[in-house]
Amino acid sequence: MKKIIYFASLLLICSNNSFAQKDKNKAQDNPLDKISLSGLSWRSIGPSLTSGRISDLAINPDKPFEYYVAVSSGGVWKTSNWGLDYTPVFDNESSYSIGCVTIDHNNTNIIWIGTGENNNQRSVAYGDGIYKSVDGGKSWKNMGLKNSEHIGNILVHPENSNVVFVSVYGPLWSKGGDRGIYKTEDGGNTWNKILYIDEHTGFNEIHMDPRNSDVLYAASHQRRRHVYTYVGGGPGSGLHKSTDGGVTWKEINKGLPGVEIGRIGMDISDANPEIIYAIVEAAERKGGFYKSTDRGENWVKQSSKVTSGNYYQEIFADPVDQDVVYTMDTWMAVTHDGGKTFKNVGEDFKHVDNHAMWINPNNNSHWLVGCDGGIYETFDSAKNWDFKENLPVTQFYKVAVDNAEPFYNIYGGTQDNFSMGGPSRVKTAHGITNQDWFITHGGDGFESQVDPDNPNIVYAQSQYGWLVRFDKLSGEEVGIKPIARKGELDYKWNWDAPLAVSKHKTGRLYFAANKVFRSDDYGNSWEVISDDLSRKINRNELKVFGRVLSMDAVAKNGSTSPYGTIVSLSESPIDSNFIAVGTDDGLIQITKNGGQNWAKIDNIKGAPSLSYVNSIYLSKHDINVMYVAFNHHKYGDFKPYIFKSSDQGESWESISNNLPERGSVYSIEEDHINKDLIFCGTEFGVFFSPNSGERWKELGNGLPTIAVRDIAIQERENDLILGTFGRGFYVLDDYSSLRSINDYYSSSNSNIFNVRDPLMWEKSMPLGLPGKAFQGDNFYSATNLGPVAMITYYHNDNFSSLKSKRQKSEKELIKNNKDVS
């Protein structure tokens, strides 16, 4: 058995983690598969400064201090102490995107999870069905509906734990799949589809009359998203009612808008179950807030209050006052008169973009609210808010590193939580805390870059190309976004515009919309070095639901980037004139003369048509080598598509090979020493190949199931850094041993790899004591790498320690009834 062991030593004290090898009988034929890498472990560094998007909350009715958090892109977390600490309980399952969580009130150890976020934004991820735990989240079992991709909500019968109803939203990016209202009567072992509309329509909510469990209400929603558009409604949307436990259903849309309807959010007033509220999205701005006082038979419009069905459109009725209802929206609003008027609740020191709410039935001034910035709690109806600053579920789109001494910094842009930076290591004895992080720009954050010669110059951006130059010393931001010249059409910016800092000339930047821009003065001025490099397709002529739709379709093109934009960009580290870009409509364009002429690369064999070019990468070692990753998940195709060219794009070969079939590729990175060692970030983890993509192996120890949107290498330290979409940043300290892994497939020798020069310092304690000091249990601290030496070594299957040799010898002596001496 071959093993690699990795450990850190501090003075004379050391610890080690073995790269335990799989059983030989289970080993696959490929030598790479036979080497386990469990000793190379990822280090989570947070941050938890701004947390991340929450889909749902489930509070234990018997012990309200215990609750579960469904994170949109970060798994499931549990607290048993009102949020003093949170523990991830879903990290090892096959999905990380969560739409809903439900506690069985008959047995609070039974927890149901619906995977796949139940919103329809551009940044949602997908799941693989329904999960169930019978031990309070310690273990999970997938209970089916694996082709649902997105789950709306889950209802457990109040008297029978075996009876469960599920609103199955179904695929967002394609037709078909599991969608409808499903019911189980055997605890999830089998499911019956009890309500179905069509292949384009799913259900986002189901509710039960608290007085009669046979009375059910359900909201159907027809929607579709692609790279080029979003359509948020259609003839399949509406309200439905059953009075026999779901055996039969009827539509209950009397009084609702007569035009096409979008998403509908519902709630039944526990204070007076005769009252049902609905917030209705509709075409032609005819939506509004509706009320029924006859169990859904008739609906009366109370006001024109609506939110976005793409991202919000959920309501929560107060459990005590029948006239009070809260709407989830950018700014949370409340009505005190049954929907006639609304006002914002007040969120002066709270993150906006709200999605989930719990109102304490015993004190309706006490709420928990889940939003894009994590979890907040109020005890006085939003006059004051407490932020749960210990939930590290930030969604990073991109990651970058600087060359600061002694410890480099890590930068990135987040979904709705700014662009920020922070240290890879700290000198204190407290770990990496929220106070160690700093904001470089506001808004949704995207690609950041750092001047390679001056780590105090940081480039950060928010959505649609709003680029700034941030001075780390002064805190000053200067806007440097390229603006269309006189007589030039406005540029088309992607939500996540690509940015690059030149490796050849100080102060040179590249940035892209539908055209490519170059600056030689740190962004103070820009030169346009290309025409529009997209296909120039009119997205309104493309089909949705199998046909071209009117511009008046519900929410058409809502929350969607302009179509025909550049989304990836790479400057050759070898030749400054060689630049490559990729577009959202499936084109690669290259220039070999600094932008004077561009050549189009199209129709790569094996690549889907019009596929999003998520990453384009020009080799650090060979001017002829290029890598490209296509991401086709917004057309319902989750396969990995990664290709290599060895002749500057003249020909291509697929190197997806043994990458998992389920998991689009987002990013590519190449080692700076070994030209054959490459990495790719996917929807479900990070993989490396020691042979340029011939064979891949996952680097998963210490990393939860999560999307890896971007990868960076800190070359001085040989560190690999991940930007994950829902669990912050992760660092693999000194991965250099992977460069030689090919040498040890058949070796019978042992080896100690080169040791990185360690740093030594005396840990400071600005808080007076090490660790959390006197800050309380909710003080967030991520794992720091202290003053240790990182040592990696390899040994063959004949290796054994002196202790194990002694024990083996003693065992034989004891067996033969001899003295152990």
Set out the residue ranges of the language-model regions.
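Bacterial Sec-dependent N-terminal signal peptides
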Residues: 1-24
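Intrinsically disordered, low-complexity segments
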Residues: 7, 13-16, 609, 786, ...
